[in-house]
Amino acid sequence: MSEPADIAAMTFEQALAELEQIVARLESGQAPLEDSIRMYERGAALKAHCETRLEAARLRVEKIVMGAGGAPASEPAEFG
């Protein structure tokens, strides 16, 4: 299942901010059931988008190392 086009166009920061708003509204318990379900579904899509963006950023990060002969080189950074 692909995410809605408006979510796909969001930056990580935009998606995270909206996700935080949704969480706050859901935690308040004030929304009707159907609205809560819609918010939950959108929140799940936003969460997936944020995870995808974070993974893409992680893959782009490289560690600069001294290669053979003292020349600088880069290699994928290790996380975890």
From Swiss-Prot:
GO cellular component, one term: exodeoxyribonuclease VII complex
Top-level division of the source organism's lineage: Bacteria
A GO term, aspect molecular function: exodeoxyribonuclease VII activity
Compartments where found: Cytoplasm
Primary localisation category: cytoplasm
Subunit structure: Heterooligomer composed of large and small subunits.
UniProt name for this protein: Exodeoxyribonuclease 7 small subunit
